[in-house]
Amino acid sequence: MTRKSFSFFLLGLILTVGIDQTVKYWIMHNMLLGTEIPLLPFLSLYHVRNSGIAFSFFSSFSHWGLIALTLIILIFLLWLWKNTEYNKFLSRFGLTLIIGGAIGNLIDRICFYYVIDYILFYIDDIFYFAVFNLADTFITLGVIAIVTEELRIWIKEKRHSKRTFSR
């Protein structure tokens, strides 16, 4: 691991966790639990507490069980980041986003025993998506970055093997 690579990783973590925690702090101190602030016809800030993981999965786990599960996942993600090839920039960036998002939600879980969620997408009274937060968004964007890079590599290899095979 190069010093430059590790510096970018740390900067990414500081930014993702810092932004996530700053917004959550604002939500907690400016919105009562259960209140909504419409932003757009399909988007609101809606202050809720999530005692589970994504989409309230594992909400039956104990507080410490969820923390332990998150720590195990974080250790695995750190191992993946360290062992991902340097030229796979998008994957390393994606893992940084995922790790930062996981740390942001872990901080909530340790400090408050729940995660602060506040982003609500909806279509009138027809469709409501699960309420989530920026940390969840970072995790999702990280997964998209990794999948994008892997698909790009797979397509490139497929094209290369077709050219090689057709000769």
UniProtKB/Swiss-Prot annotation:
It is a multi-pass membrane protein. InterPro entries: Peptidase_A8 (IPR001872). One of its GO terms (cellular component) is plasma membrane. The active site is at D117, D136. Pathway: Protein modification; lipoprotein biosynthesis (signal peptide cleavage). It is found in: Cell inner membrane. Keywords: Aspartyl protease, Cell inner membrane, Cell membrane, Hydrolase, Membrane, Protease, Transmembrane, Transmembrane helix. The keyword rRNA processing does not apply. This is Lipoprotein signal peptidase. It comes from Bartonella quintana (strain Toulouse).
